[in-house]
Amino acid sequence: MSNLKEIKRKIKSVHNTQKTTNAMKLVSTAKLKKAEEAAKRSKIYAQKIDEILSEISFQINKIVHNEDDVRLSLFHKKEQIKTVDLIFITADKGLCGGFNIKTLKTVSEMLKEYEAKNINIRLRAIGKTGIEYFNFQKIELLEKYFHLSSSPDYEKACEVIHAAVDDFLNGNTDEVILVHNGYKNMITQELKINHLIPVEPKSIEQTHNSLLELEPEGTELLKDLMKTYFEYNMYYALIDSLAAEHSARMQAMDNATNNAKARVKQLNLAYNKARQESITTELIEIISGVESMK
């Protein structure tokens, strides 16, 4: 009887867990739809900025070797790389399966790779998971940003990327790389590594049928264009990462719900078997008692 009570208690516990994971799955599904739409819109805008950059690339190529213009230093790849800044995004919350693993593994591998080349790598961490992981590994973080990956904010994204751009312009770093796990579709996430700074001018010419007219000239346009380019790449990465996080959490909760269902089924079978054995034992005892009274 005590065994039956224990199994019944387990069934109730697992069933409650199933309800919780199913509710979290539904919440993640709703959030995913919203984040997916935001990611799609942001991607289109980011692609348009890149197209504009491609359109004026022929002008950039003409003036990119002008070392005196600070704006153009963002296009100069340094001959010797001594310091690299790595911005990476992880989730602020858990229960999202292996969403963070790809990013953390890639960042750890890049750390080893650059250290083997005697290149100093500085980490700018966005998201509680990544911050706690490298704190546990006792690896120093240059900057830590909490609550940004779970609630992308354009002004905060600008703050992150402006700090990296300023460090590049001031000679504190030679390269800036952005790493995040991005959204591909509802069941797949895709690791993205963006070598953000220095920018490589596109090796194409302006097309004859282009509808874009440049006013003012490329040198005057670069400052505002590059500012928007960096800011929106950072902001898009945050939105893209959030959509991927919701996708991963939806899958994780779906798997947990299915596992809970399977476990409840197993426990019900165990309960029925134990109950059947208990009834059989009681019947045998009753029959034995009747026989002994004859």
From Swiss-Prot:
Protein name as annotated: ATP synthase gamma chain
UniProt cross-references to CDD domains, sorted A to Z: F1-ATPase_gamma
Membrane topology classification: Peripheral membrane protein
Main location: membrane
Gene3D superfamilies, A to Z: 3.40.1380.10, ATP synthase, gamma subunit, helix hairpin domain
Family the entry assigns: Belongs to the ATPase gamma chain family.
The entry's keywords: ATP synthesis, Cell inner membrane, Cell membrane, CF(1), Hydrogen ion transport, Ion transport, Membrane, Transport
Function of the molecule: Produces ATP from ADP in the presence of a proton gradient across the membrane. The gamma chain is believed to be important in regulating ATPase activity and the flow of protons through the CF(0) complex.
Natural source organism: Campylobacter jejuni subsp. jejuni serotype O:2 (strain ATCC 700819 / NCTC 11168)
GO biological process, one term: proton motive force-driven plasma membrane ATP synthesis
Alphabetized PANTHER family for the sequence: ATP SYNTHASE GAMMA CHAIN (PTHR11693), ATP SYNTHASE SUBUNIT GAMMA, MITOCHONDRIAL (PTHR11693:SF22)
Pfam families: ATP-synt
GO molecular function: ATP binding; proton-transporting ATP synthase activity, rotational mechanism
Location of this chain's protein in the cell: Cell inner membrane
One annotated Gene Ontology cellular component of this protein: plasma membrane
Subunit annotation: F-type ATPases have 2 components, CF(1) - the catalytic core - and CF(0) - the membrane proton channel. CF(1) has five subunits: alpha(3), beta(3), gamma(1), delta(1), epsilon(1). CF(0) has three main subunits: a, b and c.
Keyword Cell membrane found: yes
